[in-house]
Amino acid sequence: MNYQALPKIDLHCHLDGSVRPQTIIDLANQQNVTIPSQDINEISSLMIAPETCQNLEEYLMRFELPLSVMQTEEGIERISFELFEDAAKENVKYFEVRFGPQLHQLQGLSFDQIISSAVKGMQRAEAMYDIKGNYILSILRTMDKGNINDVIDAGAAYLNKGVVAFDLAGAELPGFCHEFIPYVNYAIEKGYRITIHAGEQGVGQNVFDAVSLLGAERVGHGIHIKGHQGAYDLVKEKSVALETCPSSNIQTKAVDVLSNHPIKAFYQGGVLITINTDNRTVSNTTMTDEVRKVMEEFNLSREDYFAIYRVSVEQSFASDEVKQELLKLAE
């Protein structure tokens, strides 16, 4: 099967984990930012996580270098454009990218400037390539909560004009959902769709809470519903899709090896699953790679692929018009 040629949808990808290494060097030189090396191989090695990290925290350390050059409007716009360009070149037809505006204020940018720059980069790529996209605004669970509503307010001006959803991301502690109920409710009032990182690090109860307390329509990763019957049943009952990211799950030790990833069991059991990259640079992957790995490891057919593709379309936060165009590609 020609995996490159398949139309693809990626619903879970982080902007700051998907930066071209050469762009880090270029922007650092333009911005007078000190980086450890001018050698692209060394920069790449600092950005790409090992095949298996000790834990999620070691994986998340790989984001410090790209964030150092994502503190200007020009830097954010370029990186946004290049990510959509890279995806378009491997036949990703619809792409939801997420990022945390709170992480881009080190040089004084406003949330409006940050969000606007990301959206502009995406729109520049949409005008040049056969790709459509949207942004998801991620709040980092470990950061100060004082400006969460400010992020929501700034993004509200871009709702359905490049921004569609609200997310909680970063290190996952048991029971985190309770702390964020008022913020998620505020986002829902403003018109945001909701996806939540949960069940990545062994806590199935977090998935149950994300759906029951926060109204999550999709769950980032969610693989640990496998050991939590209540969460498993709720996800099926509510038709909540899991945004699975196979390579990333192995790197962060959420799963030990791909053959033990629950994605096929979920698929066969009627759980709605999607295949995604998570971080193209940090995980050293593409959608083509992720699809190939899953298809070959679990012996899935072309029909299986397009069944998963249709779930991705239906569970996306795209407009009905875009969804209709995407579904035509599966006929």
Swiss-Prot record:
Major enzyme class: hydrolase
Reactions listed under catalytic activity: adenosine + H2O + H(+) = inosine + NH4(+); 2'-deoxyadenosine + H2O + H(+) = 2'-deoxyinosine + NH4(+)
CDD domains membership: ADA
Entry note: cofactor: Binds 1 zinc ion per subunit.
Cofactor(s) the protein requires to work: Zn(2+)
Keyword Ribosomal protein attributed: no
Record GO biological process: adenosine catabolic process; hypoxanthine salvage; inosine biosynthetic process; nucleotide metabolic process; purine ribonucleoside monophosphate biosynthetic process
Pfam families: A_deaminase
Superkingdom, taxonomy of origin: Bacteria
Residue stretches in coiled coil: none
NCBIfam families cross-referenced by the UniProt entry: aden_deam
PANTHER family: ADENOSINE DEAMINASE
Name of the protein in question: Adenosine deaminase
UniProt organism field: Shewanella woodyi (strain ATCC 51908 / MS32)
